[in-house]
Amino acid sequence: MELFGESDAENKRRILRYFELLEICNEINDNRPAKKGQRNVSIIQNIDGNNIVVINDIRFKGKRSINWKDVKEYLKEYVGDFYKIASTGDVIYIGSDLPSEYSGSEYTHSMRGTNAKAKANAAQGIPEIIEIAIGKHYRKNNEIKHWRNAMYGWYRYDSRFALPVYANNEIEKYNIFHASLIIRYSEDKKMYLYDIIDIKKETSNPIEP
């Protein structure tokens, strides 16, 4: 209480937000024991109070290019699953269209190098990337081809994940990436993950192993 008394309104807001995000982080990690055994994924929080999904394995390597067919096949394992965004309570479903869109969209095929590798391997952390997402921005659907599967519009959320960087076959650090989740609000009044775009490596300090 003394800390709040000495802080200005903005600092108080940041402190409260920090503890709110920390609680979300702990809750997600505590509720996912089975998933951890199948995928080497965890959630941490950086010094700015941002939750980050740490993906510890590089499953899709590709020295020159990513084999997106392998990514597509991997994503099919999620179809039919659903996950809740902790900050909003929104339930996000994984539809049968995600594997093709995620691996074959124009955005995906425009990616090269580090960002392409990041998107491919982010597939391993999709459940957690959804669960820690924040922000919620709506836009109306104006595309005829999506008049049914996005009848009630589109939402965009922000999320973060981290991937290891190796040196001499050992993890040297983890690079952090920001990403935007594109969610379609379908005619069945359910929200579906459509794609993950705008993947960019953050210039802030990387995570040490």
Sequence positions of predicted segments:
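Ribonuclease/tRNase effector modules and their secretory precursors
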Residues: 1-209
